[in-house]
Amino acid sequence: MRSHFFTVLALTALVVPDGARADWLQFRGPNGNGSIAGNENLPTELSEKSIAWKVPLPGRGLGSPIIVGDRVFVTAASGPDQNLLQVLCFSSTDGAELWRRSFWATGRTMCQKKTCVAAPTPVSDGVRLYALWSSNDLICLDLDGNLVWTRGLTLDYPNASNSLGMASSPIIVGDTLVAQIENDSESFAAGFDLKSGTNKWKIDRPKAANWTSPVVLKSGGTLVVALQSSKGVLGVAPATGSEIWNYSKGASTIPSGAAAGDTLYVPSKGLTALRPGAGGGETTLLWNKKTQNPSTASPLISGDKVYIINSTGVLSATNRADGERLWRVRLKGPFSGSPVASDNGHLYIFNEEGVGQCVDLSGAEGSVVSEIELGETIISTASISGDALYIRSDGSLWKIAGLPPSKGEAEAKSQSAP
């Protein structure tokens, strides 16, 4: 393997407090399905008063923010050719920039106009940060921004690219970083050692452009990585890349699947629920609903339902057990990002025009209860941490939070506590 060390253009340092809590560490949250537990106090009355802070970003990015303890991390790409790759760290409290690192891209930076080089979402194990760009540059930093290792994957795999841009986000399973570098030429998926960045495994993948991200699910009590492509979904062992099961009836190449327990909900001929067989056993097709067809947004799993948004901006709630559609509500689109939810009974989604919508999921039918207009283009998916939403637009990073309790409310809460 040939490692390529980038030129570090800026160096600062900040100590991470001991015991910092990692919460939203990857694309679509801790479970990779858009939902998170324990955030009951997220704002439901979205308005300008909900904006806790807004900070400018030096370049475009489609990747979501990730949150580790009290820090928010985003990637960006700037310059006329988007060849300046950047990682930025902000305080979640006030949006203060804590550090930024800049690197020169070693791979191709050509992209379709709507997307950009900083399309993948970074991932963290709570100790280090791993960032991948469309240029196939893979960088590992510690949480102080110190460089640990880099891989210029184009140096090792020179034909691994497509003219539209890459967007698949890496994930971490155990001590392995899994990434899909799928395209119409040198297409592959690989597992990288977290500490060194060296290949643990590499497998060939279908030669076709693909923007989906890997998903983890349990299969027979064992964690399996699901790799989605136009051919279907392949389940592999995260440590070795060896095949465990294969669903070969096709799937989408834009919205990714979502898992809950041992069940995978895949955008495949509409929406398909699968229970893969353990140890290479037969995969069970639980149900398929051709009329429930996700568009760009990936399915969201929250409670006993799976939520999808179709190409006309209609949000549907589906019973996870049997695929029955329970209700539909029309949202203001268009959408490129995916919905997220917490256990406060509400769903959040931002459209391409910068309008954030909060949907109450607690009733017999969903209803939009509030909106916020940020006035900037948003192609990304929001993240959740504590009692706040974090969303990046083309030019800014935003924190959306509820209003702090009044003095009287705080005193009443204190008096009612045991």
Predicted regions and their residues:
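Bacterial N-terminal signal peptides
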Residues: T7-V16
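Bacterial N-terminal signal peptides that target proteins for export
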Residues: M1-T7
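Noncatalytic, solvent-exposed loop/strand surfaces
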Residues: D18-P418
